[in-house]
Amino acid sequence: MAPPSAPLPAQGPGKARPSRKRGRRPRALKFVDVAVYFSPEEWGCLRPAQRALYRDVMRETYGHLGALGCAGPKPALISWLERNTDDWEPAALDPQEYPRGLTVQRKSRTRKKNGEKEVFPPKEAPRKGKRGRRPSKPRLIPRQTSGGPICPDCGCTFPDHQALESHKCAQNLKKPYPCPDCGRRFSYPSLLVSHRRAHSGECPYVCDQCGKRFSQRKNLSQHQVIHTGEKPYHCPDCGRCFRRSRSLANHRTTHTGEKPHQCPSCGRRFAYPSLLAIHQRTHTGEKPYTCLECNRRFRQRTALVIHQRIHTGEKPYPCPDCERRFSSSSRLVSHRRVHSGERPYACEHCEARFSQRSTLLQHQLLHTGEKPYPCPDCGRAFRRSGSLAIHRSTHTEEKLHACDDCGRRFAYPSLLASHRRVHSGERPYACDLCSKRFAQWSHLAQHQLLHTGEKPFPCLECGRCFRQRWSLAVHKCSPKAPNCSPRSAIGGSSQRGNAH
């Protein structure tokens, strides 16, 4: 049996539709004015969860129109959605965007297959030059071309800016409800109400296990999986399980390696339009997510969530090997390499290996000689931002933060706090492997090199590696290493060589 097609106006053969006259009173809102339609290609790109959401929203919209007395006869689209089938049918076509003969022709072909008589013969589209209804153009599916402008809402790429503007106009017609705070548009009032909670901070959905609150019900459902430990989404390639379907979709790109979406600014490629849209914020400088506690802004929502745990003190990721807890899963993964001894990041210039990528990047500056942090006051450059911050305190005449015990003054509260541990004897940084404690984090980092065996400071002349910077400087000035020039020493090693 053929699926129902979009309703057609009843009129006699050969009669032209009466032309619309200007100045008429606006007609009542119909379901076809607010409904969203899909072509076969677009329907095939939707995931099962997206199709279920589409069914719910369309039914809710039709119910709202019925309450207002504007529903009219049941559309073929609603009848198709009520059958809960995943197969695309012509009822999903927009009757205002496709020629009338297209839908009727498909219906007649389907009836021919079933052995029925052809009730509605297909009509030919009116030719150019004759009066009558002009056949509308078929819907264009945005191509994922590289190098063209990208829609910030859906992530689709277009060949030129004119096509992008046409796409935006069509989206505005389908999304008539704008947010007064940020201007983002939505198709239905319920979606707008849910979105506005992001601005107001309202969180009406509460977890009955831990009391955490959420602005949307689906976020609460995703959170509750953490308590149950359930991971219902399995990868068919490697068997790995995930809590969210989106995480599984992102993981499967590691097997296929497909990255069809290219950044027009730097050429980097991504597997999904959403990842490309997030990446492009590094070029535009956009940071749409703001912390309500300290007004700090972030490019990604996940970065904001991790940052907010600094204010709440929440650390939901415990280490199974020790008692330490972490605010993000990435920090837990990085910490567990201390127990396993894994060092997956290797230097391409020497044989040094590192457990963290940030440590590798800092180490590679030793080979390149790059110092990306210059002092704006004197021009002196540094390899680390922390070293620059400490150096800039030497230019500051006002040192407002004084030590109560010895009267020494400091330019920053962090330097004063680190200094006061000398008087109090406090050692808040403990080694995970031997429980030895230190007053400063840098001292703990140097100590942990004894356990890992890591030697991040290589001599560029002879290739010998050292655990500490000053050990390399002493080696440069040693008479036993005549080929190692003191000028290439790290930090102030050249000055030490001249002193000797």
From Swiss-Prot:
Pfam families (UniProt xref): KRAB (PF01352), zf-C2H2 (PF00096)
Biological function: May be involved in transcriptional regulation.
Keywords: DNA-binding, Isopeptide bond, Metal-binding, Nucleus, Repeat, Transcription, Transcription regulation, Ubl conjugation, Zinc, Zinc-finger
Domain annotation KRAB: ranges: 29-100
Biased composition annotated in UniProt, kind: Basic residues: 128-137
BP terms from Gene Ontology: regulation of transcription by RNA polymerase II; skeletal muscle cell differentiation
Species the sequence originates in: Homo sapiens (Human)
Disordered, as annotated region: 1-25, 90-146
UniProt main location, coarse: nucleus
Cross-link Glycyl lysine isopeptide (Lys-Gly) (interchain with G-Cter in SUMO2): where in chain: 455
Zn finger limits (C2H2-type): 149-171, 177-199, 205-227, 233-255, 261-283, 289-311, 317-339, 345-367, 373-395, 401-423, 429-451, 457-477
Keyword Repeat (UniProt): yes
Localization: Nucleus
Biased composition (Basic and acidic residues): 113-127
GO cellular component: nucleus
Family per similarity comment: Belongs to the krueppel C2H2-type zinc-finger protein family.
GO molecular function: DNA-binding transcription factor activity, RNA polymerase II-specific; RNA polymerase II cis-regulatory region sequence-specific DNA binding; zinc ion binding
Entry keyword Lipid biosynthesis: no
Name of the protein: Zinc finger protein 689
